[in-house]
Structure formats: C-alpha cells, structure tokens
C-alpha cells in the first residue's frame, strides 16, 4: 500500500514542497467517492459488513493524509487562513471611532432555540463582514441568559457595542445609512450575495485546497470568533471535563427526540446511531490501540442514557470530539459540526448524519456537478451527463441522493451519490482594504 500511495502522490509534488490544488481535490474526491460507494454497497449487500477487509478501501485512502508528507503543510495552512479571518473580524469589530463606524444591528432574540439563535448571529456576522459594517448584537432579555450574550460569552467588540449613529434605516432601504437594521434570514429581501453557500473569492483558492466543504469552514470561523467564554463559563466547562475524565479518542453522539420527532425529523433508534460509532472505532483499531471506547452523549431524552448504558456496556458515556453521529436536521448537530471544522484541518467527513445533508437554514441552494454519467435503472432515478448541475434535496446515505437536474429539468429524483462532486463554490467578490492575504 505504501508503494501505491507514494506513486500516487509523487505525480503531484510541486517545486516548493506543497501539494497542488489538483492533488488535494483528487485525494478528497477519491475519499468521498469511495465513502459514497461504500454506503451503496453496504446498503445493497448487508452481509459484506461481516468481511474482515470491509474497511480497507477507506483505510487506504484515509492513509494518504499521513503518508503523502503534507500533514504539516495542511496544519500550517489551516492555521494561517484561520488567523487571517480572525484578524479581519477583530479589525471589523473594533473600529477606532465607534461614533463614526458603519454598523449592522442584529437582534439575538429570534423566536427559536439555542442552535437556531447561534445560526442567526452567524448570518448577521457574515452579512456584517460582507458589508464592512461593525456588528452590534442586541441581546438583553436573552432566554439563555437574561443579562444578554455577555453573561456567557465575551462581547463581540471591545470598543463598539452601541447602536447609536447619525442615521438609521432598515435593510437596503438606504445603503448609506450609518446604522442598518438586519431582518431574520427568512425575511431578507432582496437576497444577498453574501449568504451562506458563498465564500470570499480572495481566499477561495487556498480554502478549496485544504478543505472538503469550504462553506462549513467559513461558517466555523465566525463561531470561533463568537464563542469565547467568559471566565466563569470556561471554569464550569473545564471542571466538567475533569469530572468526567474527557479524553480522546471520543465520538460525539447527539440524539434529538421530544418536540422534533414527528414534526421536523423522524425517529431514529439508539442502534442506528451506535452502529456508526462502532464502525468508527473498528476503523480506528486497525491503526492505533483504543483502551476505552468513549462517546460524548447529548440528548433531550433522559431514557437514552439508560438505554445506551444497558445495550453498550463497553462504552464510557461522557464538542471536542473526533467524530460526530447525529441528525443534521438539528441545529445543535450542525453547530457541533461547524465548531469541529474550525478547530482541526479538514474535518469535512468526520460525521455521520442519519437524515439531512449539511445545510445552513436560509442558504442558497446546494449545487453539485456530475462527474460520471448515469443511466436511470428505475422510474425514481434520473439520467446524468458529465457536467450536469444539480441541486441537492438530501442524501439517503445508501449510496443515493435526491435532487434536481437543471439541464434536463428532472426534479426530485434519485442518482448515485458517488457520481457527483462536492458542492460547487459560490464566490462573492470582496476586496478587503486591510489585512489582505499575501497569496491566493
């Protein structure tokens, strides 16, 4: 295997010791294609899971990240890009003269839960970044801390938290007003080119080279800036980590029940979640010892704790996890995935969702590109030609996804997931006048 890997990546080595964009894209496509094909095969032929070699294709391609010699470069590039965005956000949020700064006002108290409200602030922050406005977060009376955001997290600015200004106006009423009020994403009219799904063009080249889902990396950077704990909050979390002996490797399992089931999401048994946890640890055992299998369980149903302890006694039940098993229909699940991708290089595939593909509520459509042709085998499937642009409604996690073909105008039909590429980037042009990247 080592010889095959060396032959593979030696074809893409450049003169300065960095992998080419083509190499990184091909490596990532190889991994995602094998993963999607594996889901197809395992769904059609369940007994194949009993074979001792069942994980070897995934293990072989995962090994490229270590065997190709670029791990240090990826880590450094990840840290450099993240540092660039964090410095830009810090500059934007801390103007030298708050009384003259252009501002975007966001009301935290959207009528929804914690995860939804965090995504609302991310949306506001992304819009502020695109418009070059300082984000002013109104949070007094917040349901999760009546004193406001600052009772749990640090303020988003050290120098500018007042919404005062010489002129005020609603979204797009007058782009020149000093203080603009932003509606929730559901009511945003006209729509904006900055909405999630898009990433800035000045970092797109570097970002597509190091990450399999640039959109989630981009969103994760705003969470990284936002979620800076007050000392009391950090102390509480540190104490909890010591109390439960939080150690890696660990899989995060988020099981949402109660009000979600039957309305926004279907019921999924504990066994469905834990089968993917067990699969992860089986793969890990091939390459390293695992003295104790641990999961970090988050759920709104107390009975789940008892059920997992009874059915899986070999697990220690404890989002700095190495892998996530959850449902992307849940905002909290998506928040955990976004945070994970802000902390480690390219964690795009470190998850298993039991329902939806990753999305940001209110975002622009998911666009994918067909890289292999397909002839429909059943009335539920669609034909594909190489280059077809598709919008994705969801991944069935059995090797098939559902979507619409913009060329043939076939809607809500199935196609093999491994025959399409990851979502194409939507770029917005934004030339920062400050803290520009020194390379693309």
Would you name each region that the model predicts?
Residues 1-278, 283, 288-292:
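Secretory-pathway glycan-assembly enzymes, especially type II membrane glycosyltransferases
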Residues 2-12, 318, 408-431:
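Short, compositionally biased segments
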Residues 93-96, 125-126, 240-244, 285-286, ...:
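Beta-strand elements of modular eukaryotic interaction domains
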Residues 99-101, 115, 246-248, 290, ...:
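Eukaryote-biased feature marking scaffold/signaling PDZ-domain proteins and nuclear chromatin regulators
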Residues 124, 128, 135, 251-253, ...:
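Structural signal for hydrophobic/aromatic residues that build the beta-strand cores
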Residues 291-351, 358-359:
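Donor-binding and catalytic core of enzymes assembling or modifying cell-surface/extracellular glycoconjugates
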Residues 367-398, 402, 406-425, 440:
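SH3/SH3-like (including bacterial SH3b) beta-barrel domains
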Residues 429-440:
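Long, low-complexity intrinsically disordered regions
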């Amino acid at each position: 295997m080592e010889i095959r890997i060396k032959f593979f990546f030696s074809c893409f080595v450049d003169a300065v010791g960095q992998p080419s964009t083509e190499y990184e894209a091909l490596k990532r496509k190889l991994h995602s294609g094998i993963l999607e094909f594996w889901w197809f095969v395992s769904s059609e032929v369940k007994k194949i899971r009993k074979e001792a070699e069942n994980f070897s294709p995934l293990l072989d391609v995962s090994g490229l990240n270590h065997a190709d010699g670029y791990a240090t470069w990826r880590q450094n590039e990840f840290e450099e890009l993240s540092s660039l965005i964090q410095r830009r956000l810090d500059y934007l949020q801390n103007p030298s003269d708050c009384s003259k700064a252009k501002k975007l006002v966001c009301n935290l108290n959207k009528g929804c839960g914690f995860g939804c409200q965090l995504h609302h602030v991310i949306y506001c922050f992304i819009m502020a970044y695109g418009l070059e406005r300082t984000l002013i977060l109104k949070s007094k009376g917040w349901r999760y801390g009546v004193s406001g955001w600052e009772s749990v997290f640090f303020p988003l600015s050290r120098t500018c938290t007042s919404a005062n200004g010489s002129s005020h106006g609603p979204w797009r009423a007058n782009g020149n007003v000093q203080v603009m009020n932003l509606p929730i994403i559901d009511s945003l009219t006209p729509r904006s080119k900055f909405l999630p799904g898009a990433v800035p063009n000045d970092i797109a080249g570097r970002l597509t080279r190091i990450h399999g889902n640039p959109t989630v990396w981009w969103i994760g950077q705003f969470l990284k800036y936002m979620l800076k704990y007050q000392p009391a909050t950090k102390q509480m979390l540190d104490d909890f980590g010591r109390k439960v002996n939080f150690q890696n490797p660990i899989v995060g399992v988020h099981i949402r029940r109660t009000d979600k089931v039957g309305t926004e999401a279907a019921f999924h048994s504990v066994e469905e979640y834990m089968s993917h946890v067990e699969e992860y640890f089986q793969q890990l055992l091939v390459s390293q010892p695992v003295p104790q299998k641990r999961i970090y369980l988050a759920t709104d149903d107390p009975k789940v704790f008892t059920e997992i302890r009874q059915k899986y006694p070999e697990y220690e039940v404890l989002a700095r996890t190495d892998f996530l098993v959850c449902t992307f229909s849940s905002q909290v699940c998506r928040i955990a995935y976004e945070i994970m991708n802000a902390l480690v290089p390219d964690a795009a595939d470190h998850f298993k969702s039991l329902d939806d593909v990753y999305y940001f509520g209110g975002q622009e459509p998911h666009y994918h590109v067909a890289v292999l042709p397909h002839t429909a085998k059943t009335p539920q499937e669609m034909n594909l030609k190489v280059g077809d642009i598709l919008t994705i409604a969801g991944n069935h996690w059995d090797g098939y996804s559902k979507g619409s073909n913009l060329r043939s105008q076939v809607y809500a039909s199935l196609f093999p997931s491994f025959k399409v590429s990851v979502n194409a980037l939507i770029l917005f042009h934004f030339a920062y006048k400050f803290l520009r990247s020194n390379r693309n």
